Each structure stands twice: as structure tokens, then as C-alpha cells.
Amino acid sequence: MRVRLLTLLARLRAANERVGHVMNDVAGWLFVVCALFVSFDVLARKFLSVSSKATVEITGYMLAFGLAWGLCDALTTRAHIRVDVLVSKLPLRFRVWAHGLALAFLAVLGFFFAWRAWAVVLESWEFSARDSSALTIPLVVPQSLWALGITAFFVLTVLMLTEVSILLSLGRRGQVDRMLGPRTLREEADEALEAAGLPHGAS
């Protein structure tokens, strides 16, 4: 029963990871567009004495939900900043429980953020709130995108935490350590080679 449930959770997590990867790509392109928009506005002010008058608001929205949309991919690829000097020196049987505890705290934090994010969206919806720029964008639009990214992150933490709990009950400590532990130097080198378009193992 636990093995079948573990298989189902792994599939759900993989689906969430694929969605998170797409969201991360969208977030990356948003930052590019944001940089281009700011650059254009600066140059237009300098040489044409004109401004979009909405740069701050639009780029603020892009940065906010772009960051939220990158959370899932950062977690699954273990790209987030980690301070685990002590944890990495623990024996495996203790290390995996430390990883699980950290993930549990992350899930609680994700729930709180998702809960408060949708509360903000609901409040903006009830008051038909709009921004103060010339575009008067309904705040519920960018806020919903922002809350969606946080919610996807929370769902991923719950799926991972459930999967890790079952793995620990089955005694699969190595699998938990590979899932939640820091990336190895080999993994980081392979990622750098892949980004450079070089075959893995090339010097």
C-alpha cells in the first residue's frame, strides 16, 4: 500500500515539477522583459523627455509574481541558498530527519504565505482595487498571479513532505538524502556544462 502511494506521489510531484519548470521559464523571460522595459524608459527620459508613467508599477508586478513563480523550480533543483554546514556532517540516519524537519517547516511557511496571499487577492476583489498608475490595472490580476506561484510552491512542499515521510517509514534514507540534500559538485558541474551547451564530462 505504501509503495503504491509512493508511486502516485512521485508522479504527482513530477507533474508539479514540470509545471514549476514552465513557471520558472516564464519568470525568467519576465525579468528580461522587465529589464528591457526599464532600459527603454530610462533612455526615453534621457533623450526624448518622455516616460511611460507606469514603469514602477508594471516592473513591480513582474518582479513580484516572477519571484513567486520561480519558487517551485528552485526547490526541486535545490537551487535555493542553504546554510547546512552542520547538517552535512551528520550521519545519514540523523541527516535525513533534519532534511525532513526543514521541509516540514518550509511547508508550514508555504501554507502561511499562500493563505495570506489569497487573503490579499480577496480583499482587492471585494474593494475592486486598482493601482494608481495611468493604466489603473485591477490589483486582483497581478496579485492572483503572485498568489498562484506561492500556492504551487506550497502544494509541492506538501507532496514532497508526504513522499519523504513514506520513504523514511520504508527505511530509504539514501533516496531522501538525494532528494533533499545539497547538490554535489558533480551535479553543479554538469549543470554548468549543460548551460554552456557542452557534453557532460567535457573539460
Language model features with spans:
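Alpha-helical transmembrane segments and membrane-interface helix-loop junctions
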Residues: M1-S203
